[in-house]
């Protein structure tokens, strides 16, 4: 969902499931609209199967937000992925935002399918997360992020259900916003740490052509049920690089020897981080 600052937002939720739900607009102030905060038995009655509820509020908080179900959060958010991004564009962006040529959202989550099955039998969570994803997909099925040399890329990072340590190869990140709010002093970072519910905006100047990976730096988050590589990994690919599909779903993509040898023959970038002085020298003045 994407709106502009000051818009009157009206969203009608129709419950076509067999469970009760509400929608919480995470990060919204809900000034004079507390009935739309989505907290069951506090601001509203839960929306039961077959019912509808309309949320109405003014988009008075700008930046990267998100929405999620607020009923039985460990199950509905943690296991059933009932969440999504909610972007409110400001009337007056900060100067560096005006340079952005490409905008992308990365939402991080994880789950354990065995626990999800036990929920249906009245079970409870407690087992470790075994699958990790970006925008609902695990590597090597994550959607590649394609850019052009010279792009100014903004990544909106959202930790939906788990801790994240995001790291892109081959490029600097300038951290400009936290939880939707612009920072008084943007700073460079090599790794961004997020806790569940946190959001960061980072800007990257795409000046290092090749094919690179970006991933969660928590080691087991880059696996699928213990098989690596997988999980929270995606490819950043520059326009003009030969577009073969080595990273699409293949059994051998789970083979570490393939990943660290065969993949490196597919163009510069993978595991080849050259020393460079940085993308934002103005911050060092």
Annotate each predicted stretch with a short phrase.
Residues 1-88, 163-193, 212-236:
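Histidine- and aromatic-enriched segments that form or immediately flank copper-ligand environments
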Residues 76-114, 195, 201-285:
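Extended terminal and domain-junction accessory segments
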Residues 102-147, 269:
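Acidic-aromatic/histidine active-site loop/patch
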Residues 146, 151-166:
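Long, repeat-rich segments with strong aromatic
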């Amino acid at each position: 969902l994407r709106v502009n600052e000051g818009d009157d937002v009206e969203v009608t939720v129709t419950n076509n499931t067999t469970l009760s739900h509400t929608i919480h607009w995470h990060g919204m102030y809900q000034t004079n609209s507390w009935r739309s905060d989505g907290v069951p038995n506090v601001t509203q009655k839960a929306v039961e199967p077959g019912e509808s509820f309309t949320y109405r509020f003014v988009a008075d908080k700008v930046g990267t937000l998100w929405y999620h179900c607020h009923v039985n959060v460990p199950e509905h958010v943690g296991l059933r992925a009932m969440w999504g991004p909610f972007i409110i564009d400001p009337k007056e962006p900060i100067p560096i935002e005006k340079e952005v040529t490409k905008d992308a959202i990365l939402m991080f989550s994880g789950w354990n399918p065995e626990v999800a099955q036990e929920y249906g039998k009245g079970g409870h969570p407690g087992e470790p997360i075994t699958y990790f994803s970006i925008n609902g997909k695990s590597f090597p099925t994550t959607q590649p992020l394609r850019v052009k040399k010279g792009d100014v890329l903004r990544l909106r990072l959202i930790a939906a259900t788990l801790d994240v340590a995001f790291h892109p190869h081959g490029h600097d990140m300038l951290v400009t916003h936290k939880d939707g709010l612009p920072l008084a002093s943007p700073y460079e970072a090599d790794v961004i740490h997020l806790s569940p519910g946190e959001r960061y905006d980072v800007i990257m100047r795409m000046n290092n052509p090749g094919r690179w990976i970006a991933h969660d730096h928590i080691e087991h988050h880059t696996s699928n049920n213990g098989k690596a590589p997988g999980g929270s990994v995606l490819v950043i690919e520059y326009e003009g690089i030969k577009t073969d599909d080595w990273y699409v779903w293949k059994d051998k993509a789970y083979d570490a020897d393939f990943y660290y040898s065969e993949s490196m023959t597919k163009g510069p970038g993978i595991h080849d981080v050259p020393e460079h002085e940085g993308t934002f020298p103005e911050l060092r003045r």
